[in-house]
Amino acid sequence: MNTFKTYADRAARHPNGCAKALFELMERKQTNLSIAADVTTKKELLHIADACGPYICILKTHIDIIDDFDEDLVAQLCELAKKHDFLLFEDRKFADIGNTVKHQYGKGVYKIASWAHITNAHTVPGEGIITGLREVGLPLGRGLLLLAEMSSKGALTKGSYTTESVEMARRNQDFVFGFIAQHKMNEKDDEDFVVMAPGVGLDVKGDGLGQQYRTPYQVIVESGCDVIIVGRGIYGNPDQIEFQAKRYKEAGWNAYLERVQKH
């Protein structure tokens, strides 16, 4: 199964350009860490991006919560992505009909498709949401993740919802290259979906607001996910951002090496 191959092997065989670029980057930097920078000021976001940049493969943003957003922020994020060799993932979670998301993705204040290598979407509206996003993103070489599972307590993303999300992805592999999920989604030998898992923590089990945490070992080795998404565990203490980023990078990479060796 592709999940158990090295990132380099998966990059060499992957038909999706965005997934190929991500796997090559992960192998090159020896990291499967994504930082979830859920902060509300331009200064904080840029500081986290620069401090964590050497240790991550992906910077995950919520650009619409930045109080002082401007076009210079996007320009600086793109420069930092080049400087430190990481991809930008706008965690937009699109959830409307195709014609609406097409404009939300390509136009408006944020013009997400112009700078974010990756974005994501709920599948609740049906397959039209993928069609609308693809129209904008595919010509730019962007990639889409579908939300198949979430890490919050009581989430409704399970059962038939998850199953149908996987089927939608299979029908749209030119643009959809993976999932936000809690375990591997590859069931066939000829498919290789990237799975990014939120809710990863080394020190805590929850946050009191429904978030549930698992360790990098649980996520990568036991559940077969590919990228660990970490937020407050890294930047919660401003004085330890680089230390924690390096710590999670090493934990995630060591878990990956163990998974590959086991198979």
Curated annotation (Swiss-Prot):
Record key words, sorted: Decarboxylase, Lyase, Pyrimidine biosynthesis
Signal peptide: none
Catalytic activity: orotidine 5'-phosphate + H(+) = UMP + CO2
Enzyme Commission number: 4.1.1.23
Sites where the protein binds substrate: 38, 60-62, 91-100, 213, 232
Recorded metabolic or biological pathway in which this protein acts: Pyrimidine metabolism; UMP biosynthesis via de novo pathway; UMP from orotate: step 2/2
The UniProt record lists the keyword Lyase: yes
Superkingdom of origin: Eukaryota
Active site: 93 (proton donor)
InterPro entries: Aldolase_TIM (IPR013785), OMPdecase (IPR014732), OMPdecase_AS (IPR018089), OMPdeCOase_dom (IPR001754), RibuloseP-bd_barrel (IPR011060)
CDD domains xref list: OMP_decarboxylase_like
Gene Ontology MF terms in the entry: orotate phosphoribosyltransferase activity; orotidine-5'-phosphate decarboxylase activity
Record's keyword annotation contains Ribosomal protein: no
A biological process from GO: 'de novo' pyrimidine nucleobase biosynthetic process
Family affiliation: Belongs to the OMP decarboxylase family.
Protein name per Swiss-Prot or TrEMBL: Orotidine 5'-phosphate decarboxylase
Originating species: Rhizomucor pusillus
Upper classification of the organism: Eukaryota, Fungi, Fungi incertae sedis, Mucoromycota, Mucoromycotina
Gene behind the chain: PYR4
